[in-house]
Amino acid sequence: MPLLGDNLAKQLGTTGDSNRTDRMGLLMLISPPGYGKTTLMEYVADRLGLIFVRINCPALGHDVTAIDPANASNSAARQELEKLNLGLAMGSNVMLYLDDIQHTNAEFLQKFIGLADGTRRIEGMWQGQARSYDMRGKRFAIAMAGNPYTESGEVFKIPDMLANRADIYNLGD
């Protein structure tokens, strides 16, 4: 687990004298389909006692740019956004996992920058009400996974502002 352990310790904190109070970070896994990214993260979440909240990004598509379920263009996207907001509302002991991020809009992915930096904040919606989620001091981790290529065959480009805050591992190399 050395590959993921340092990042998750940075996000969740560690126990004992080395406990970090400046929790931050984002874990990003890139590889072709079938390499086991989702299975790996489900296993890690289980071992760490975290609730695994998987967001199916292809259901969101490129039209979704906001976290508000009311703005979703279809019921599948709305359901995924409701699940995302539920994970944020639960707050502690959660691993939020965005799967197949190459199928989403870069503007949507950039909404998670605040969770990756020292502020550990994100704006969302809970039961129709705008809400600011503050994850500082909570056992909350965010991970994203994607394919290095988009559905059109082009190379997937991770937004720079997100890439600067993430530990990115290419499992396909």
Task: Identify what each model region corresponds to.
Residues 1-25:
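Pre-Walker A (pre-P-loop) alpha-helix and adjacent loop at the N terminus of AAA/AAA+ ATPase modules
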Residues 118-173:
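Canonical AAA+ ATPase core
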Residues 18-55:
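Walker A/P-loop
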Residues 7-11, 69-83, 108-137, 172:
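Substrate-gripping "pore-loop 1 plus following alpha2 helix"
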Residues 89-117, 153-161:
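Conserved AAA+/SF3 P-loop NTPase catalytic/coupling segment centered on the Walker-B
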Residues 37, 61-66, 104-107, 150-155:
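Switch/connector loops and helix/strand junctions flanking conserved nucleotide-binding motifs
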Residues 22-24, 48, 89-92, 136-139:
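Short loop/turn elements that form and flank the Walker-type P-loop nucleotide-binding site
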Residues 47-88, 105:
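AAA+/P-loop NTPase substrate/partner-engagement loops
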